[in-house]
């Protein structure tokens, strides 16, 4: 089955090191979660490292329960963090967070998700109206929250 890719980038007025450190703190995961994907269970390590696992329970739109177990499979500070689903709703899921210096200062954050949607060929055919739509909504929210949290004067940002 074909692997699909979703990618979104954002420029942040924060150093690449600060952006990377923010993503290394598991507590920030709850801060980035949209309200329509309410976190019902979160078992986190104190800090992410290769081999770290986290368990996440979410309820999409308040109705659809999902359980995930995700493992950090690559860590290249301050540039790259990769997590892969060990179990969850997707047959395959790899999320790569890449942080690089931004043009003119700051940092560029790229979230790249490689995935195989559930439902086989029907899942691939429906991807535009299901998984891709949800990923777009989720990462727009996550990037907006990341910007707020890293750039606001109250949180020590720009």
Predicted regions and their residues:
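Hydrophobic ligand-binding cavity/cleft-lining segments
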Residues: 1-50
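Short alpha-helical segments used as structural interaction elements across diverse proteins
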Residues: 5, 56, 125, 129, ...
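Glycine-rich portal/gate segments that line the openings of hydrophobic small-molecule binding cavities
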Residues: 41-87, 108, 141-158
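Hydrophobic/aromatic beta-strand elements that line small-molecule binding cavities or substrate pockets
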Residues: 8-10, 41, 67-74, 85-86, ...
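Short strand-connecting beta-turns/loops that link adjacent beta-strands
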Residues: 15, 77-78, 102-106
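Beta-strand/loop substructures that line and gate deep hydrophobic ligand-binding cavities in soluble
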Residues: 84-137
């Amino acid at each position: 089955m074909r692997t699909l890719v979703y990618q979104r980038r954002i420029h942040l007025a924060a150093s690449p090191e600060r952006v990377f450190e923010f993503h290394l703190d598991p507590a920030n995961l709850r801060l980035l979660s949209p309200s329509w994907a309410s976190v019902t269970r979160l078992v986190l390590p104190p800090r992410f490292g290769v081999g770290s696992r986290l368990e996440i329970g979410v309820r999409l739109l308040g109705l659809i329960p999902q359980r995930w177990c995700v493992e950090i499979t690559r860590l290249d500070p301050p540039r790259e963090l990769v997590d892969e689903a060990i179990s969850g709703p997707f047959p395959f899921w790899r999320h790569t967070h890449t942080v690089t210096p931004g043009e003119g200062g700051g940092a560029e954050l790229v979230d790249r998700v490689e995935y195989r949607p559930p439902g086989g060929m029907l899942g691939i055919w429906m991807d535009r109206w299901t998984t891709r739509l949800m990923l777009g909504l989720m990462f727009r929210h996550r990037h907006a929250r990341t910007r707020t949290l890293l750039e606001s004067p109250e949180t020590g940002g720009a």
